[in-house]
């Protein structure tokens, strides 16, 4: 993409309404625009990042055996009456009446609808286990939306729902999603720590929040430093191997980790002082087993191997892709702007033509652009006629992992300068050497 043809509305000043780093940088870099309180449009560069996050989530959900569907945003109130939640849900639910005076709602979550889909088609235990997921926009009318897309009223959510014959099957479905989430966050470039969460009236221990450590996090968290050294499950993980999954979950739940709500001082005291990490954290995912909470009132049953009907045991598993984008910025930025992990960077590299109109600079810039494009690097070529300082500031702000600087002096010497955004290191390379280095990383 050529910057001269790209819609990138950069803001020179920090927006006054932005309270945290991610909100400020997303507005400044032209990723999002606020349309009303807690509601945002995603602009081209922001949407590219969001789509990359969703692609990784999809790949890992599919790898774990989940099936993607797409449920509507507008739901019937009748389904929620079946589960008993319509009257219990507060003002955060946006309630709607259509022209036939039927009561509808803008879905804040999808347990009722997915249970209705399941009970309409599945009759036998032989069709289990089953995991259905979708990625869809949701709406919750927060009393005080703040922090940009970190706590917005409209947000994108990946929610998965598992259906099993019994608790043992549901536990393994939970373990599959647990491991899938570890891989998902690692691929996005984040180190997420699973922390035991409240299970409410269901009880048991199958509820975890996935937290990344960040100074601007909303939650106070406590964990054993051992988490920082744990190896994330590899691409060769066999999601059909229950023993392997159980071993991974055991390793990732043995060290101490808790949010402020679940913190236990007695258990915390057992952690060696040098291993104690007390920090702020951001929740980026939540997985939860809720048994027959929805299958019982909605009659979601299957015939078991004993010939009798059994209520299915269910779980839900959520990741907010839009929130995850903001969390990635909170975890990786500096005073100049965003520092994107390579996997979700909007472009693979930025080419900075320091002197558009100069035959040498134009020629080398075009050569680099064509070579990187053909290699699948997806470069952004800054071909705009602006002063060098503004060009560098833009590239640093939008956070592309690598910048290739093409200037008259370098071109005369047959070289370009390559800058690593994260490390800040610069090196001069021959043009072909630079192409080879960047295409090898594609």
From Swiss-Prot:
Keyword set, alphabetical order: Aminoacyl-tRNA synthetase, ATP-binding, Cytoplasm, Ligase, Nucleotide-binding, Protein biosynthesis
GO BP term (any one): prolyl-tRNA aminoacylation
Top enzyme category: ligase
Family matches, as CDD domains: ProRS_anticodon_short (cd00861), ProRS_core_prok (cd00779)
GO terms of molecular function: ATP binding; proline-tRNA ligase activity
Record carries keyword Nucleotide-binding: yes
Keyword Cytoplasm appears in the UniProt entry: yes
Main location per the UniProt record: cytoplasm
EC number(s) from the headed UniProt entry: 6.1.1.15
GO cellular component terms listed in the entry, alphabetical order: cytosol
Subcellular location: Cytoplasm
Catalytic activity: tRNA(Pro) + L-proline + ATP = L-prolyl-tRNA(Pro) + AMP + diphosphate
Function: Catalyzes the attachment of proline to tRNA(Pro) in a two-step reaction: proline is first activated by ATP to form Pro-AMP and then transferred to the acceptor end of tRNA(Pro).
Subunit structure: Homodimer.
Membership in a protein family: Belongs to the class-II aminoacyl-tRNA synthetase family. ProS type 2 subfamily.
HAMAP family with a match to the protein in the record: Pro_tRNA_synth_type2
Protein name stated in the entry: Proline--tRNA ligase
